[in-house]
Design a protein with these regions (language model features):
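ATP-dependent adenylation/nucleotidyltransferase module used to activate substrates
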Residues: 2-157, 189
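Mid-to-C-terminal catalytic subdomains of enzymes
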Residues: 148-193
Length: 193
């Protein structure tokens, strides 16, 4: 509310962390609507385009949360469907696109410059990380052009062991699950999904 932003943006991978992040946004709005009432939530969130009478949580969520599934050739159908189902359940505005072209472009440019062919056997971490990092400019663009806060999706367990990807799942302005461990995240996800 104090940020004067229009809501939140999340790169929704269909995994536990991004799912937990959007569930927390949903739960925050659900509880606010129960506690304050629809009219007060609409007023506090400055949702002038919404009718105050009979405004559902689905309508509010569609206006304050954008989720994006950014698939690569290594993404599974399971994660894509999971992201889609969760986005439908919480009523976020949801988009999907492929990052294959951008990943290929980066790898090709570096291969050409270094005269080296990169492969999954020898360069697994670098190839995984380039996929995570190439998603960042796209989701930042969506956040910036909609005056929204980008929520990062890195959890405490990953940070503790150095598993999070800088400029990948750590990319964002606020990290709602940074202090939550993976075990709790999975329990919370199982409760909702």
């Amino acid at each position: 509310i104090k940020s004067k932003c229009n809501g939140f943006t999340v790169s929704l991978s269909g995994g536990a962390d991004s799912s937990c992040t959007v569930i927390l946004v949903y739960e925050m709005i659900r509880r606010a609507m129960l506690e304050l009432g629809e009219k007060e939530v609409i007023k506090k969130l400055n949702l002038k385009n919404l009718q105050e009478d009979n405004c559902s949580i689905n309508t509010v969520m569609k206006n304050i949360l954008i989720t994006v599934y950014q698939k690569s050739k290594n993404s599974s159908l399971d994660t894509e469907l999971s992201a889609k189902k969760l986005a439908q359940f919480i009523s976020s505005t949801h988009f999907k696109w492929s990052i294959n072209e951008e990943v290929k472009s980066i790898i090709d440019k570096i291969s050409k410059t270094t005269n080296k062919k990169y492969n999954w056997k020898n360069d697994n971490i670098a190839l995984q990380n380039v996929q995570a990092r190439v998603r960042s400019p796209f989701i930042w663009f969506i956040a910036n052009t909609n005056n929204m806060i980008l929520l990062s999706t890195s959890n405490r367990s990953e940070s503790a062991v150095g598993y999070s990807t800088m400029d990948g799942d750590t990319s964002g302005s606020v990290s709602p699950i940074a202090g939550i461990d993976k075990v709790f995240i999975k329990k919370l996800d199982n409760f909702y999904v």
